[in-house]
Amino acid sequence: MYFEIEKQAIDAISDALDKFEVDNTLENFQVEDEKNFRLEFPPNPDMGDLASTIAFSLAKKLRKAPNLIASEIVEKLEIPEIFEKVEAIGPYVNFFIDYSNFSKKLLEYVGKDYGHLPKADEKIILEHTSANPNGPLHIGHVRNSIFGDSLNRLLKVAGREVETQYYVNDMGRQIAIIVFGITELGLKIEDQEGDKIDHKIGRLYFKANQKLNEDESLVSHVDNLIERYEGGAEPELNKIFEEVVESCLLGIKETLHRININHDDFVWEGQFVRSGEVDDMIKYFDHEGFVSYGDVTYIDLTCFQIEKEFVLRRSDGTSLYSTRDLAYHRYKATQGDVVLDILGSDHKLAAQQINVIFKEILREIPPEVIFYEFITLPSGSMSTRKGVFVSVDELVDEAVKRAADEIKSRNPDLTDEEIKPMAEDIGVGAIRFFIAKLSPEKHLTFKWDEALSFERGCASIQYAHARACKLLKKSGKDVSSLAVSDDWVPNENEKDLIRTIAKFPQVIEDCANKKRIHNITQYCQDLAGAFNKFYKAEQVIGSDVEDTRLVLVDRAKTTLKNALDILGVPAPQKM
């Protein structure tokens, strides 16, 4: 619906430009060029519902001030029926929607899939989370998971085909340290502290790592395990490695599932060694003359302005994570049209190396990377290596507990059984929303008072959805059978809500094109705010336009739920 009225506005301006008589100065100007011809949402409804900046693009060609050009465009423009008026406000051409005409059409258009864009002929392989399976997910990982999953949801709504992958580091040193703890120190996973198996494995890893720090002579034992597992010739050893990884992944998947995250595929890095793909790739580099030999086998990247060499093999002949990662990226490139990685900012050098190797040596399209800064609690950052971390499980438990306490204080008559599901929805929603609301490039400190605020946080948005559900239920009517009155002329509160609902598809398109999700959180806040303003000011049940307003409430509820779904935030029907 939004794109329809946008097209009408663009066509109207295009027709107006055709009427210009300026000695062929517009001869080479293409009005279809999106870079020169775009519409925006004005910051204030008093300035209209849509605005064009085309006067800026024409100023140099016409050698006129943009505000004069905007006025000329408006003079020559024929106003489409969907608009009440068009005005030149400064250098902008501003369109004002005729809400007596538009509102009924919009409310009839909005359905359960509202916001979903047409299918695009593009498949994206999106890798996110990919934490080492040597312990539970901690708060340092969770921004990757939440951003990656929300981006996956956004891109799917925007019409892209997306496959999410978790890259499993089964050949990493961390797993070998755990196997060392089991096979040589006699440690047992089941004997460790923790309610979940990933926590038990994390404790075992910590103990084994401590032992290695105390006795450096044991480090060679870990090196030996890495070499033997990579060789793949010992079924019993392979089984121990694989059971450790699979067990830890069970716990990690459980954590991810609790915060509404699931992956389509888990790809083990070992498969690229066992299949010979890593060896074949190194042989190719060698054949092309890019491999250097010394203590290690490496590619010298200084000719590509990267000082640090890209190591392919250790002195003992084993491959590195970076080598296997390169093979994995080549594999991903065969699975889709776009390869998209979500990586912490500490991976920038490695990503730069991969980028150069793909472009300059392999002559292939490199992966697209979105970097994020790390998230901390006010007390500081965390590390699994030192055994001092706040796990995602603990973070969610704390969020749910705080939410339950707040619900209880506001609703003392509710039972614990009634509170439990609401607290889970609010706690999970608070974490996901708070982390999603900031651009990934910015450092984020997790603040409980902001995240769980029932006035400003995600809970206030969830409450708007629950409030709409309660109102519809209270009406006792089947909203699907209700019709919008033909003579309904919306007031200012209704207009504001309709205007906000109408923006949703454009917000989806903009965010998907930029591959960023934080503006979805802002949209949720705007929509919840517009609904709450309407709810407080306008009578619905018992009003002269009861059916129409019930339809408006239902469409606001649907849009808000769809927006929250993109963020992976529950939309409770009761709070």
Swiss-Prot record:
Protein's GO biological process: arginyl-tRNA aminoacylation
Motif position, 'HIGH' region: 131-141
EC annotation from Swiss-Prot or TrEMBL: 6.1.1.19
Reactions the enzyme catalyzes: tRNA(Arg) + L-arginine + ATP = L-arginyl-tRNA(Arg) + AMP + diphosphate
Main location: cytoplasm
Disulphide linkage map: none
Listed Gene3D superfamilies: Arginyl tRNA synthetase N-terminal domain, HUPs, Isoleucyl-tRNA Synthetase, Domain 1
InterPro entries: aa-tRNA-synth_I_CS, Arg-tRNA-ligase, Arg-tRNA-synth_N, Arg-tRNA-synth_N_sf, ArgRS_core, DALR_anticod-bd, Rossmann-like_a/b/a_fold, tRNAsynth_Ia_anticodon-bd
Protein name listed in UniProt: Arginine--tRNA ligase
Organism: Methanobrevibacter smithii (strain ATCC 35061 / DSM 861 / OCM 144 / PS)
